[in-house]
């Protein structure tokens, strides 16, 4: 269920303050954050935000297409390594001993 329009989007106060300070100074530094639930605003475009995925901080370069999405959508938390088991030989199973 989306957030109520009367409340407005959630953006962590410190994160928004850092981005606005960097915009006024013209800086482009990586901003480290744990706030995966923060909405990406148009002020974030062009900045790199390091979003925590539970283990490390994943650098996310913000583009115009990302505005309105949440930061956590671009930092996957699960790593798929494939299903268990090795490669099967052609021709069936190994020969049986009698």
From Swiss-Prot:
Signal peptide start-end: none
GO cellular component: cytoplasm; small ribosomal subunit
GO biological process, one term: ribosomal small subunit assembly
Protein keywords: Ribonucleoprotein, Ribosomal protein, RNA-binding, rRNA-binding
GO MF, one annotated term: rRNA binding
One Pfam family, short name: Ribosomal_S19
InterPro entries the record matches: Ribosomal_uS19, Ribosomal_uS19_bac-type, Ribosomal_uS19_CS, Ribosomal_uS19_SF
Keyword Nucleotide-binding: no
Similarity field: Belongs to the universal ribosomal protein uS19 family.
PANTHER family, sorted: RIBOSOMAL PROTEIN S19P FAMILY MEMBER, SMALL RIBOSOMAL SUBUNIT PROTEIN US19M
Role summary: Protein S19 forms a complex with S13 that binds strongly to the 16S ribosomal RNA.
Protein name: Small ribosomal subunit protein uS19
Lineage, highest ranks first: Bacteria, Pseudomonadati, Chlorobiota, Chlorobiia, Chlorobiales
Name of encoding gene: rpsS
């Amino acid at each position: 269920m989306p957030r109520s329009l009367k409340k407005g989007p959630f953006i962590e106060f410190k994160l928004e303050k850092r981005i606005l300070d960097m915009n006024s100074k013209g800086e482009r530094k990586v901003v480290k954050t744990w706030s995966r639930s923060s909405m990406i605003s148009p002020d974030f475009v062009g900045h790199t935000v390091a979003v925590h995925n539970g283990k490390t901080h994943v650098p996310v370069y913000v583009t115009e297409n990302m505005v309105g999405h949440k930061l956590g959508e671009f930092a996957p938390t699960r790593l798929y390594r494939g299903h268990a088991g090795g490669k099967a030989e052609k021709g069936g199973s190994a020969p049986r001993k009698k």
